[in-house]
């Protein structure tokens, strides 16, 4: 997840929302859910972020395989949750997610091993030298990835290592180890995560084809140059359907731009996925805003359809009731496929219709 705005450079792309489409209920089959439709076309998963809580409606939607056959732990596997003190591991939350995946027959996208945020102070402020920090990183990856060896279909190994201009973000890992921290992390993940697990680099604001997207391509080439396993690039896709206070004027790109960005990575031999998708706007919702949002969701889905190695799409939650966005951007939200009362929105219909409309290749 990210809390950054889209840079002014995105305006140079001249991207705007396409004319909203009327996704009438007569134009698609309501007898399928999202995951059912997606897997019937030969693709791997439609997923959602999971926080286990006492809400039987939300949890019931996630438990069913109709709409979601994959889950991503929203916070339970992050460093501050799993190793809050050095070599003192706490797995209750992460184990609960893994048990949920087993019980309800879900794929599990595990998130995330090395990230500058939600990192305990003992790591970020420890003043460790290069050798010690690498040892700490290996121990963390060994214990966390090793605990869920081959249970995770994917691991976001390194998360958000880039600035908006494509340069490396200042972090304890980069400042101490240099760019080599990235292939080193992937080497440890390759060693401990299990041969069945796909290893990903994950970041936000890649979708616009800007310098940051090229930075992620550079990371991919870097890891490959070390001869280390890297299987995919995750595009978080925290997007908007209109210009908002937080986006600096950018909106969800057109299908061709999105498709071209995905191909930046698949042309280098890896797969891609949208990993944290939501599409916000300035609230309150209106019919026009909901239609524009539906069209934006459809563009994202269509771009994934266009690229055979785009294996899946994860939305960052089920209902607007629990979305992270209003807590960070108070005038924005309504970004998910179900509203706060768990009614399916036009965006749900647009995603389902778009999936059902493409022919399996």
UniProtKB/Swiss-Prot annotation:
GO terms for cellular component: extracellular region. Its EC number is 3.2.1.8. Keywords: Carbohydrate metabolism, Disulfide bond, Glycoprotein, Glycosidase, Hydrolase, Polysaccharide degradation, Secreted, Signal, Xylan degradation. Optimum pH is 6.0. Residues 1-26 form the signal peptide. The keyword Protease does not apply. GO terms for molecular function: endo-1,4-beta-xylanase activity. Its main location: secreted. Disulfide bonds join 304-310. It is an enzyme of class 3 (hydrolase). GO terms for biological process: xylan catabolic process. Residues 46-354 form the GH10 domain. PROSITE patterns: GH10_2. The keyword Disulfide bond applies. Optimum temperature is 70 degrees Celsius. Gene3D superfamilies: Glycosidases. Pathway: Glycan degradation; xylan degradation. Coiled coil: none annotated. InterPro entries: GH10, GH10_dom, Glycoside_hydrolase_SF. The active site is at residues 160, 276. Pfam families: Glyco_hydro_10 (PF00331). Glycans are attached at residues 88, 130. Transmembrane segments: none annotated. Belongs to the glycosyl hydrolase 10 (cellulase F) family. This is Endo-1,4-beta-xylanase 2. The lineage of its organism: Eukaryota, Fungi, Dikarya, Ascomycota, Pezizomycotina.
């Amino acid at each position: 997840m990210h809390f950054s705005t889209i840079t002014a450079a995105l305006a140079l792309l001249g991207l705007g929302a396409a004319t909203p489409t009327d996704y009438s209920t007569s134009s698609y089959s309501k007898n399928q859910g999202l995951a059912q439709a997606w897997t019937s076309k030969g693709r791997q998963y439609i997923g959602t972020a999971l926080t286990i809580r006492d809400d039987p409606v939300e949890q019931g939607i996630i438990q069913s395989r109709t709409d979601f056959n994959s889950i991503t732990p929203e916070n339970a596997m992050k460093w501050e949750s799993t190793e809050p003190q050095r070599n003192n591991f706490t797995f209750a939350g992460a184990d609960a997610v893994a048990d949920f995946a087993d019980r309800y027959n879900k794929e599990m996208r595990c998130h995330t091993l090395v990230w500058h945020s939600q990192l305990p102070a003992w790591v970020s402020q420890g003043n460790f030298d290069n050798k010690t920090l690498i040892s700490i990183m290996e121990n963390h990856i060994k214990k966390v990835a090793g605990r869920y060896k081959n249970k995770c279909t994917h691991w976001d190994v390194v998360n958000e290592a880039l600035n908006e201009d494509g340069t490396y973000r200042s972090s304890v890992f980069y400042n101490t180890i240099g760019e080599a921290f990235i292939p080193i992390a992937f080497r440890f993940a390759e060693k401990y995560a299990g041969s069945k697990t796909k290893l990903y680099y994950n970041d936000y604001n890649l979708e616009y084809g800007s310098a940051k997207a090229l930075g992620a391509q550079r990371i991919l080439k870097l890891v490959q140059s070390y001869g280390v396993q890297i299987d995919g690039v995750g595009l978080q896709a925290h997007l908007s359907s209109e210009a908002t206070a937080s986006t600096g004027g950018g909106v969800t790109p057109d299908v061709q731009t999105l498709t071209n960005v995905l191909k930046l990575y698949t042309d280098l031999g890896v797969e891609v996925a949208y990993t944290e998708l939501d599409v916000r706007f300035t609230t309150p919702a209106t019919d026009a805003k909901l239609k524009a949002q539906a069209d934006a969701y459809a563009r994202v889905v269509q771009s994934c359809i266009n690229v055979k190695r785009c294996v899946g799409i994860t939305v960052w939650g089920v209902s607007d009731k629990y979305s992270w966005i209003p807590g960070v951007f108070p005038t924005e939200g309504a970004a998910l496929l179900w509203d706060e009362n768990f009614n399916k929105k036009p965006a749900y219909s647009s995603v389902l219709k778009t999936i059902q409309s493409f022919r399996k290749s």
